[in-house]
Amino acid sequence: VKGVVVKLSEATSYLNPYAEMQVKNALVAGLKVSAYHYSHFTSKEEAREEARYFVAAAKRMNLPKSTLMVNDIEEYVTRNNINENMKAWEDEMRKLGFSNLIHYTAASWLDNNSLRILGPIETGKFGISNFWIAQYPYDTMHVTQAMSMSLHSSSAAWQFTSKGTLLTN
C-alpha cells in the first residue's frame, strides 16, 4: 500500500467526522493522501457549490493544492447534464487552486467501456486517463489475476473489487 483516498465530503451537507484522523494517520504511516467527494449535483451551480464545499474541507485538513482530488459520481440523480456539470465542478476546483483531478465512477456510466452499454459520461471530454473506474468482472479476483487482465489500463485506476483485505505482518 502506497497511499489512501479519504472521503472528505458529500453533497454540501456532510463532512466525514473521521477524515482528519484518517489523513493524520496516513501521513504518519508515510502514505500518500488523496481525497474524494461524493457528488449529488444536478446542475452547474450545484456542481460549483459542491466543489467549494470539498475544497473548504481539504483546506481544513491542510491538504496541499497538489493533492489528488476525486469526484465520486455515481448517484443516479446526477445523470442529467452530467458532462456539463462535471466540467463545471472541474472548472471550480481549478479556480480554487486544485488541478490534480480525476473522476470515480462505474464502467457502465462511461461511453467507452467493455460492457457494450453506452453510459452518459463522454470520456472524450475529460480523457479516459482522468477516470478511476469500478468494474468487478468476477466475484473473487486476486491482484495478480487483475494485473494480467489489463482491463482499463489507460485509465487513472481500475477498482476490480469491492472486497479486500490488507495483509499484515
Name each model-derived stretch.
Residues 37-40, 103, 142, 152:
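Histidine (H) residue identity feature
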Residues 98-112:
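Aromatic-lined carbohydrate-recognition surfaces of secreted/lumenal glycan-active proteins
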